[in-house]
From Swiss-Prot:
Protein name, UniProt field: Large ribosomal subunit protein uL10
Cross-referenced SUPFAM superfamilies: Ribosomal protein L10-like
Organism: Azorhizobium caulinodans (strain ATCC 43989 / DSM 5975 / JCM 20966 / LMG 6465 / NBRC 14845 / NCIMB 13405 / ORS 571)
Record has Signal as a keyword: no
Function: Forms part of the ribosomal stalk, playing a central role in the interaction of the ribosome with GTP-bound translation factors.
C-alpha cells in the first residue's frame, strides 16, 4: 500500500467514523476466508459494514471523531464493524461471535459513549429502528381497530338475535 492509498483509506475511514452511529471492534484471528465472507454478507444484509484496516491508519482516522476512544481497542488483528442503525452491527457481531469462538468482541462506541463487550451485547438485544417503528404503528392503529370493533358489535349482536328468532319460528 503506497502513501496515496493510505491517505485515501484514512480519509474514507474518517468520513465513516464521523457519520456512523455505532462502531464495534473485535478480534478475528483464526477465522477462515469463508467465515469472514459469511460475516461480511450478514453485515451487508443488515445494513452494516465490516472493515479490516491497519490499526495505525484506523487510529489516525479516528482522531477528531465522536468515537475516538475506540482507538484504545485497536491492538492485534482487529476488525471494525459499523452501521447507521445503532443495533444492526452489534446484533450481527454478537450472533456471529456466538457461532464462532475465534471472533471475540472487544468493545465499541455508540456516539460519544464508549461500550465494553457487555455493552455491545446489551445493545444487540435492543429492537432495531424498524422494529420500534412497527410497534409504534401498531400502538397507533390499535385504538382505531377497537373503535371499529365496538361500532360493529351491536349490529352483529342484533343479527344473531334475529337469527335465533328465525330458527325458533322455523322450529315451531
Amino acid at each position: 500500500m503506497d502513501r496515496a492509498e493510505k491517505q485515501e483509506l484514512v480519509t474514507t475511514l474518517s468520513e465513516v467514523f464521523k457519520s456512523t452511529s455505532v462502531v464495534v471492534v473485535a478480534h478475528y484471528s483464526g477465522l477462515t476466508v469463508a467465515q469472514m465472507s459469511k460475516l461480511r454478507r450478514q453485515m451487508k444484509a443488515e445494513g452494516a459494514t465490516v472493515k479490516v484496516a491497519k490499526n495505525r491508519l484506523a487510529k489516525i482516522a479516528l482522531e477528531g471523531s465522536d468515537v475516538a476512544h475506540v482507538a484504545t481497542l485497536l491492538k492485534g488483528p482487529t476488525i471494525i464493524a459499523y452501521s447507521s442503525d445503532p443495533v444492526a452491527a452489534p446484533k450481527v457481531a454478537v450472533e456471529f461471535a456466538k457461532a464462532n469462538d475465534k471472533f471475540v468482541i472487544l468493545g465499541g462506541a455508540m456516539g460519544k459513549t464508549a461500550l465494553n463487550a457487555d455493552g455491545v451485547k446489551a445493545l444487540a438485544t435492543m429492537p432495531s429502528l424498524d422494529e420500534l417503528r412497527a410497534k409504534l404503528v401498531g400502538l397507533i392503529q390499535a385504538p382505531a381497530t377497537k373503535i371499529a370493533q365496538l361500532s360493529t358489535a351491536p349490529a352483529a349482536k342484533l343479527a344473531r338475535v334475529f337469527g335465533a328468532y328465525a330458527k325458533q319460528n322455523e322450529a315451531a
